[in-house]
């Protein structure tokens, strides 16, 4: 049996939109499960026949429709496309991107509000209570605790950016490893090339593969000649957006902020 009625969206849930097609209850349950689990999905409706199908990110789809789906996953925009001689409505469902910043430092003070304005759900984590104060991070989701204690309850995922800026391996290394295992879309770490070389040694000893380590953007940020904490924050945010919208090997792109 098919669910009577079209795909109707309420105002309080802007992630759904109406196409007028009938939706199979099984697809609806699958879509709701994907949204609950923060997985990317596109509901495809054939505008000629009204048939629906759900495609998860990574599912193989051939032809022009597959290319259109790939672009829609990157842009996050729903809309009508013509592919393979037919017209389809692509209803895109992407989890809200998150940014977890490890370290309540000056760079973080600039980065957190800018990232929030860009659309990221931002969290700053630092066990050092002298740094992690509400006075320094007014209006920011701030956790004065060890990253492993916080992130075990709120795991990282593929729609999370991890930015490690404490310069302290006791604080940075665990979330970096967790972000790589979770396939976070962006993993960046502050530090010079010498600092990163020592980091690579530690992560290798911890069992992280060279391929995984190569995903770390270090030194962090696009190479815009940044000097001040605010400028470095701009470079980090730009590199994060690049990784979100153009998911290539950002860490191997050679686009860095500095060696500091």
Please provide the spans of the model-predicted regions.
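Adenosine-phosphate binding glycine-rich loop
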Residues: 190-260
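Rossmann-fold NAD(P) dinucleotide-binding segment
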Residues: 171-184
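N-terminal glycine-rich "phosphate-gripper" loop used for MgATP/nucleotide binding
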Residues: 166-169
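Segments forming oxygen-rich coordination pockets for charged ligands
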Residues: 6-143, 157-160, 195, 241-260
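Compositionally biased, low-complexity intrinsically disordered regions
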Residues: 2-3
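Short amphipathic alpha-helix with an adjacent loop that forms part of the alpha/beta core around
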Residues: 148-157
